[in-house]
């Protein structure tokens, strides 16, 4: 039986005064692309990230270091309000560093920050559409008939009503928690496959895109934990005639967003077409199971683009083509991407490569 939170028992303890001290929850990406966290007490309200200490953890237990040299260091990178504890308590997104001061192998933020600094005059904006699938604690899709299947896809996308959407209360809790925390969440919707949902984060400039998406993911898995529900970011969690899960990446630069920007968008698409394989390499594991040319995807083996074409690698929204400026949508990234890798390679390809 899955463990369930006793929120009614916890509530009076969370209401107790803390004095001047606060709790800071350090959050980091582990060696397998998952999320970990642990808490420390800080003597006063944090107003400057520089006042937070560099901490450490046992990297041999997170697939980030060998046992004989297991200390990995956490350097604070971004702060968000803590929706679980409230008050002045905070969530601290941290980068991971090895004992010799080099970035850990899963610290993709380090490189991305350098890339975004080089491109800052172009003011790159991103908006990520994070799809995910919910499962019961026993591993069955949440809300599906035990040992069976729901009706075929059709009524579930942006659906309303019993039997069409599942776990809306969990999704609403996540949405409100993101707003409280300061995450730039811009929307939610039920997706094409039952028990699949999407939230959108952005627009965010530069390195903040990865920061906001990772923390939004953390809030989602923490809240789902309270519901005794599992969150899957696998790009094809269920085989058969079901949609996969992606993380469509909307991208623009200052020049793209200004009148006449369509020409810049077309130039960017041409550059992206020449590095298709390099992008696919960092666009998520098992993405070949999703990018089949079916279920609103382009084929993983070929680059394509088009206006309003959801079967293309790159989609230009119809309203963007009509007005002559705006943004493009890269539909190739899978739901399990590291956003730092995706946003940095897009900037490298379109802005920094000769």
Swiss-Prot record:
<dbReference type="Pfam" id="PF03951">
    <property type="entry name" value="Gln-synt_N"/>
</dbReference>
<dbReference type="GO" id="GO:0004356">
    <property type="term" value="F:glutamine synthetase activity"/>
</dbReference>
<dbReference type="InterPro" id="IPR014746">
    <property type="entry name" value="Gln_synth/guanido_kin_cat_dom"/>
</dbReference>
<keyword id="KW-0067">ATP-binding</keyword>
<keyword id="KW-0436">Ligase</keyword>
<dbReference type="InterPro" id="IPR008146">
    <property type="entry name" value="Gln_synth_cat_dom"/>
</dbReference>
<feature type="domain" description="GS beta-grasp">
    <location>
        <begin position="22"/>
        <end position="101"/>
    </location>
</feature>
<keyword id="KW-0963">Cytoplasm</keyword>
<dbReference type="GO" id="GO:0006542">
    <property type="term" value="P:glutamine biosynthetic process"/>
</dbReference>
<protein>
    <recommendedName>
        <fullName>Glutamine synthetase</fullName>
        <ecNumber>6.3.1.2</ecNumber>
    </recommendedName>
</protein>
<dbReference type="InterPro" id="IPR027303">
    <property type="entry name" value="Gln_synth_gly_rich_site"/>
</dbReference>
<feature type="domain" description="GS catalytic">
    <location>
        <begin position="108"/>
        <end position="354"/>
    </location>
</feature>
<keyword id="KW-0547">Nucleotide-binding</keyword>
<dbReference type="InterPro" id="IPR008147">
    <property type="entry name" value="Gln_synt_N"/>
</dbReference>
<dbReference type="InterPro" id="IPR050292">
    <property type="entry name" value="Glutamine_Synthetase"/>
</dbReference>
<dbReference type="InterPro" id="IPR027302">
    <property type="entry name" value="Gln_synth_N_conserv_site"/>
</dbReference>
<dbReference type="GO" id="GO:0005524">
    <property type="term" value="F:ATP binding"/>
</dbReference>
<dbReference type="InterPro" id="IPR036651">
    <property type="entry name" value="Gln_synt_N_sf"/>
</dbReference>
<comment type="subunit">
    <text>Homooctamer.</text>
</comment>
<dbReference type="GO" id="GO:0005737">
    <property type="term" value="C:cytoplasm"/>
</dbReference>
<dbReference type="Pfam" id="PF00120">
    <property type="entry name" value="Gln-synt_C"/>
</dbReference>
<comment type="similarity">
    <text>Belongs to the glutamine synthetase family.</text>
</comment>
């Amino acid at each position: 039986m899955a463990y369930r939170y006793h929120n009614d028992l916890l509530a009076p303890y969370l209401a107790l005064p803390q004095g001047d001290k606060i709790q800071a929850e350090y959050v980091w990406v582990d060696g397998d692309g998952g999320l970990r966290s642990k808490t420390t007490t800080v003597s006063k309200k944090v107003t400057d990230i520089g006042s937070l200490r560099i901490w450490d953890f046992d990297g041999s237990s997170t697939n980030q270091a060998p046992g004989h040299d297991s200390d990995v260091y956490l350097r604070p990178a971004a702060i968000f309000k803590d929706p679980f504890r409230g008050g002045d308590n905070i969530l601290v997104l941290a980068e991971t560093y090895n004992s010799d001061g080099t970035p850990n192998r899963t610290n993709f933020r380090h490189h991305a920050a350098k890339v975004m600094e080089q491109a800052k005059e172009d003011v790159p904006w991103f908006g990520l559409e994070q799809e995910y699938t919910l499962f019961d604690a026993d591993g069955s899709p949440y809300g599906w008939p035990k040992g069976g299947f729901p009706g075929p896809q059709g009524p579930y996308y942006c659906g309303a009503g019993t039997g069409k959407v599942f776990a809306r209360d969990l999704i609403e809790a996540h949405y409100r928690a993101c707003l409280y925390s300061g995450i730039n969440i811009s929307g939610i919707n039920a997706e094409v496959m039952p028990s699949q949902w999407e939230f959108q984060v952005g627009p965010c400039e530069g390195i903040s895109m990865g920061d906001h998406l990772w923390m939004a993911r953390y809030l989602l898995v923490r809240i789902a934990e309270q519901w005794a529900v599992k969150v899957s970011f696998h790009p094809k969690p269920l085989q058969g005639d079901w949609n996969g899960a992606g993380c469509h990446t909307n991208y623009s630069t200052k020049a793209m967003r200004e009148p006449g920007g369509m020409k810049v968008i077309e130039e960017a698409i041409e550059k992206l077409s020449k590095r298709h394989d390099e992008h696919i390499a960092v666009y998520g594991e098992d993405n070949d199971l999703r990018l089949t040319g079916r279920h609103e995807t382009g084929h993983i083996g070929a680059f394509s683009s088009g206006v309003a074409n959801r079967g293309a690698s790159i989609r230009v929204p119809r309203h963007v083509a009509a007005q002559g400026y705006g943004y493009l949508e890269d539909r190739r990234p899978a739901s399990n991407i590291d956003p730092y890798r995706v946003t940095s390679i897009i900037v490298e390809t379109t802005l920094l490569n000769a």
